[in-house]
Curated annotation (Swiss-Prot):
Residues 189-210 are annotated as: Disordered. This is Protein GET1. It is a multi-pass membrane protein. Required for the post-translational delivery of tail-anchored (TA) proteins to the endoplasmic reticulum. Acts as a membrane receptor for soluble GET3, which recognizes and selectively binds the transmembrane domain of TA proteins in the cytosol. It comes from Coccidioides immitis (strain RS) (Valley fever fungus). Residues 39-95 form a coiled coil. Gene3D superfamilies: Helix hairpin bin (1.10.287.660). Signal peptide: none annotated. Residues 25-110, 173-210 are cytoplasmic.
Amino acid sequence: MPSLLIIVLIIHVVTYLINTIGANTIDSLLWLLYLKLPNQTSQTANEQRRLKREVMQLKREMNATSSQDEFAKWAKLRRRHDKTMEEYEAKNKALGKHKSSFDLAVKSIRFFSTTGLKLFLQFWCSKTPIFELPRGWIPWQVEWVLSFPRAPLGTVSIQIWGGVCATVVSLAGDAIGVVNVYLTSKAPKQKEPATSGENSARPMAIKKEL
């Protein structure tokens, strides 16, 4: 089993990545991946997309058909359009319910695996030291702060270690972002080819000089 030190660090790394990428972006990506799986929801989504294409096709055919000159054909298209539209709305409503349930499940898993787990560990392991400090290296006042609130004196508590992890992960993420921006700005740019106007102007300038 991984140590408490590593578990707390991983929780803060995952939390930082979720906040950086965006929870809504992750939810949308997971929903798209879920629809790729062979399940009832993916079948409903495929049927919904098929009905949407059919509704649009029937709409175009209705617009291209005169309701006065070709009333029988137009009325037949209208009935097909209304029936298909009703089926599409039913599938769309069912898919919306599936997505709401999926989003709720994803949000619950994300909360309990990050914030919920962090709060539980801080409560359950409040007396468990993350690691011990060398004796006599720092004043006892500092040892008391590092062991706050309930860890043994001379050790680092899970609350203090969690704060350190959050700060270090945030600084590391900012540093990586700065390095990425720097490398992107220093990337060699392709030389733009000279325009035809510039090429034609050069011989004329040479002739004038001669």
